[in-house]
Amino acid sequence: MEKLARRLDLCQEQLLELYEQDSKQLQHHILHWKYIRYESVIYYTARQMGIKRLGHQVVPSLDVSKAKAHAAIEMQMCLESLQTTEYNLEPWTLQDTSQELWLAEPKKCFKKGGKTVEVRFDCNEHNAMHYTLWTAVYVQVEDTWTKVEGQVDHRGLFYTVHGCTTYYVDFGKEAHTYGKTNDWTVIVGSRVICSPSTVEGLPIVAPVDIRHPAATDATDATKVHDAPYALPASTTKVYNDSHAPPRKRRRDGDLSISAVDGCSGRKYVDTGNRARSPDIESNNKIRNSGGGHSTPIIQLEGDANCLKCFRYRLTKVSHLYTNSSTTWRWTTESRTNKNAIITLTYSSVHQRSQFLALVKIPKTIKHSLGMLTIM
């Protein structure tokens, strides 16, 4: 028993010296795991002999000592293999060679230079998870080691070795766990990467009169939008000049946005995608008689990053709209409202109807229809 206690003390003294040394050399970290293995073997032997204490140290169970010894052997052998490569000359910290980092994703690889990747599920900043993107991943291929760069895209975190790509974090699977929709936004520093779900919802159609394999869904959606587009009475209002209060005379070039009243924030929803009533037709005649030109628009409102991602996806179906604005906000809005706005313009009401029929707008983005009039 005393002999085992002396060996344990000697082993632990060597470990303390290595911790205090805080070396950056791989050979010292190999020694660290060698002494961890010795310590576990001493504990295992003592437990087999029925000894439960060695000095002031409590002897772990056989299973614990055995598992720790196996882990130490694995780490020592992998580090010795890594030492035979050119990566031996790189600085290595105790943390770089720890078992916790060895078993972190991607598992069974050495990793350095972690960066935080934020993933917002449902495009909600309050429903975000953080993952680690490694700038250097050391992968063992047969008897040698290869250093590759960790990468990120809309699908997840991955690395590529000899043309073979391995994803160690799949954002799609994570979205099923943490999200309610199949939308997510990836933020890496100043970069914003969007999920592919809504891209799939934006069919890159040929001219609309050509039948497409997905035409069944598009036809159904068209039927829905061809029907009267009803909104709650509190938010739906057709603008009629004959009932409006007198306005100041506009100069040429002034803008009148009938979709939104800038003073009150009330929204006026255009009904151009349905059969128009005589009042609306006469109203348009009044506008046109004054030399004005009305452009159908859709106003999108939501999280700024989510809107930017959606606008980027829309470039795949740019034939379904005319122009897209940058993100903007009302200056009179409450500071607590962090939503941004994007305005899309269309050459005709028919083009806007096609857009609504073929494009899936995420549930996290509100949209309103309207007319932009230039007098």
Curated annotation (Swiss-Prot):
Residues of the region (DNA-binding domain) are: 294-375
User: Main subcellular localization, coarse class?
Assistant: host cell
The listed locations are:
Host nucleus
Q: Name one GO biological process term.
A: viral DNA genome replication
Look up the record and report any one GO term of the cellular component aspect.
Answer: host cell nucleus
Residues covered by region (Disordered)? 235-293
Which stretches are transmembrane? none
Quaternary structure, from the entry: Binds DNA as homodimer. Interacts with protein E1; this interaction greatly increases E1 DNA-binding activity. Interacts with protein L1; this interaction enhances E2-dependent replication and transcription activation. Interacts with protein L2; this interaction inhibits E2 transcriptional activity but not DNA replication function E2. Interacts with protein E7; this interaction inhibits E7 oncogenic activity. Interacts with host TAF1; this interaction modulates E2-dependent transcriptional regulation. Interacts with host BRD4; this interaction mediates E2 transcriptional activation function.
What does this protein do, in the record's words?
A: Plays a role in the initiation of viral DNA replication. A dimer of E2 interacts with a dimer of E1 in order to improve specificity of E1 DNA binding activity. Once the complex recognizes and binds DNA at specific sites, the E2 dimer is removed from DNA. E2 also regulates viral transcription through binding to the E2RE response element (5'-ACCNNNNNNGGT-3') present in multiple copies in the regulatory regions of the viral genome. Activates or represses transcription depending on E2RE's position with regards to proximal promoter elements including the TATA-box.
- The name on file for this protein is Regulatory protein E2
Which species is this UniProt entry from? Answer: Human papillomavirus 7
